[in-house]
């Protein structure tokens, strides 16, 4: 089956040579169900955010484009509240620009570029597009707030958990007559790094 063989090659390349700030893998050994993560670019309102996407590969791939949507909420004129993305290579001609020579890495890289350079003239969210055009400061503020609230949520939870552990430790020490040496806390969050390579299972 062409889809399976093509996917195997593409996932192998994504594993050994991932585009900067992008990672992709198969979800629960399902051939057509992939997940991807894109690291928000520097000097953008999405900086330091990790955005998860769902990538569904149709049976006629690569003659049909993958179906991609954001699972992580993002404030962006070309991405709606359900995660749908307005991008030409995600649609077939004549309305779109998908062609079989493109691949998953190309799609994810294009989405990463769209995050850095929104296209307000072809929006899915008209109100956000208008804000981007005419009130850029307000747009940047809201986009950063969404990134903090949704794309960095795990980091905040880990920090809160570590803070709670420290408070408990301080309380116990205040009631103790002996001085104890502090132990290093485990369970620190693993930072997302585009250089980290993952092992991706091939299709069965």
Swiss-Prot record:
Pfam families registered for this protein in UniProt: UQ_con
Keywords on record: ATP-binding, DNA damage, DNA repair, Isopeptide bond, Nucleotide-binding, Nucleus, Phosphoprotein, Transferase, Ubl conjugation, Ubl conjugation pathway
Residues at the catalytic site: 86
Name of this protein: Ubiquitin-conjugating enzyme E2 T
Post-translational modification: Auto-ubiquitinated. Effects of auto-monoubiquitination at Lys-91 and Lys-181 are unclear.
Places the protein is found: Nucleus
Record function comment: Accepts ubiquitin from the E1 complex and catalyzes its covalent attachment to other proteins. Catalyzes monoubiquitination. Involved in mitomycin-C (MMC)-induced DNA repair: acts as a specific E2 ubiquitin-conjugating enzyme for the Fanconi anemia complex by associating with E3 ubiquitin-protein ligase FANCL and catalyzing monoubiquitination of FANCD2, a key step in the DNA damage pathway. Also mediates monoubiquitination of FANCL and FANCI. May contribute to ubiquitination and degradation of BRCA1.
GO-annotated cellular components: nucleolus; nucleoplasm
Domain UBC core: 2-152
Family recorded in the similarity comment: Belongs to the ubiquitin-conjugating enzyme family.
Modified residues (Phosphoserine): 193
Oligomer status and interactors: Interacts with FANCL and BRCA1.
Entry-linked PROSITE patterns: UBC_1 (PS00183), UBC_2 (PS50127)
Species annotation: Mus musculus (Mouse)
Cross-link Glycyl lysine isopeptide (Lys-Gly) (interchain with G-Cter in SUMO2) residue location(s): 190-191
Record-linked PANTHER family: UBIQUITIN-CONJUGATING ENZYME E2
